[in-house]
């Protein structure tokens, strides 16, 4: 996993460096775009931002060589989750107050009027990958989609399309149980989740990205790659070598803003 991720981030740095030199190139030159998206990752999990409890050497390299938006905030959601809102805002170009409406238009329904179909098609044609495609880019996607439109239609190439989160065995959530041993293990593949298929989904996404960069070299068009990792969104699973890096004595849990999760009753907690 680490080798593939290092390759991926190394190539991202190279792509970023290419973009920095565009000012001296011809105006018609289009840069390659490699967009990497982690799922629900908080700023407290990046060492470069002053949180050294976690090792993030590749993210640190990108932060040091690029631009950090340290006052950019997720404004929330129309539901108990912020992941779906983040994705719809990015893909549709809508802010939070209009992203839900865009989601509803894209979702459509079984019986739509001609006007509703036209609105859905117009919304779809303005999705980020569609715009990039019309601008002359080869477009590629892998990972978590969670958008109310078909990824394999929005992008020219889409692989290993994942939903909001994987199904998981009850052991991952119903724990710990009083006076009973904890059966859960974040690196045991029998619990499915991110291990479904035998390889951690982060590894799958990284492999897809590295492979496509190699394929894209055969095309004269610049590429737009949307690489969407499901992690660190729950279920909290990772290969053992990464779990072993973080004994409990090293982990500091961030303070909560509320005493209780406001949507706990809705999800059966």
What are these regions (language model features)?
Residues 84-198:
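Catalytic-site neighborhoods of secreted/periplasmic enzymes
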Residues 50-87, 93-94, 98, 138-140, ...:
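Short, structured active-site-proximal loop/turn typified by the sulfatase FGly-forming signature C/S-X-P-X-R
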Residues 29-34, 65-70, 133-140, 218-225:
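Loop/turn elements at helix/coil->beta-strand transitions in domains of secreted/extracellular proteins
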Residues 40-43, 68, 75-80, 96-97, ...:
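Solvent-exposed loop/turn segments at secondary-structure junctions
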Residues 28-31, 38-54, 77, 162-269:
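Active-site-proximal cap/lid insertion segments
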Residues 10-21:
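Bacterial N-terminal signal peptides
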Residues 1-8:
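N-terminal secretory signal peptides that target proteins for export/translocation
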Residues 23-27:
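Sec/Tat signal peptide C-region and signal peptidase I cleavage site
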């Amino acid at each position: 996993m680490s080798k593939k991720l290092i390759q991926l981030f190394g190539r991202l740095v190279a792509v970023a460096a290419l973009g920095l030199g565009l000012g001296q190139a011809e105006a018609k030159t289009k840069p390659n775009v490699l967009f990497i998206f982690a799922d629900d990752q908080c700023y407290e999990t990046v060492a470069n931002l002053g949180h050294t409890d976690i090792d993030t050497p590749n993210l640190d390299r990108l932060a040091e060589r690029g631009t950090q938006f340290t006052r950019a905030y997720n404004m929330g959601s129309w539901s108990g989750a912020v992941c779906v809102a983040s994705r719809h805002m990015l893909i549709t170009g809508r802010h939070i107050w209009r992203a839900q409406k865009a989601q509803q238009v894209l979702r459509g329904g079984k019986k739509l009027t001609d006007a509703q179909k036209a609105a859905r098609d117009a919304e779809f044609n303005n999705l980020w990958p569609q715009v990039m495609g019309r601008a002359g880019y080869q477009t590629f996607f892998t990972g978590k989609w969670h958008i109310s439109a078909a990824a394999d239609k929005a992008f020219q190439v889409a692989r290993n399309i994942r939903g909001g989160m994987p199904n998981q065995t009850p052991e991952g959530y119903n724990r710990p149980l009083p006076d009973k041993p904890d059966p859960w293990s974040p690196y045991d593949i029998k619990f499915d989740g991110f291990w479904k298929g035998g390889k951690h989904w982060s590894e799958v996404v990284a492999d897809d990205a590295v492979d496509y960069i190699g394929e894209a070299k055969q095309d004269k068009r610049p590429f737009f790659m949307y690489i969407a990792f499901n992690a660190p969104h729950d279920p909290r699973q990772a290969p053992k070598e990464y779990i072993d890096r973080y004994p409990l004595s090293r982990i500091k849990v961030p303070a909560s803003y509320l005493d209780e999760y406001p949507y706990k009753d809705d999800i059966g907690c």
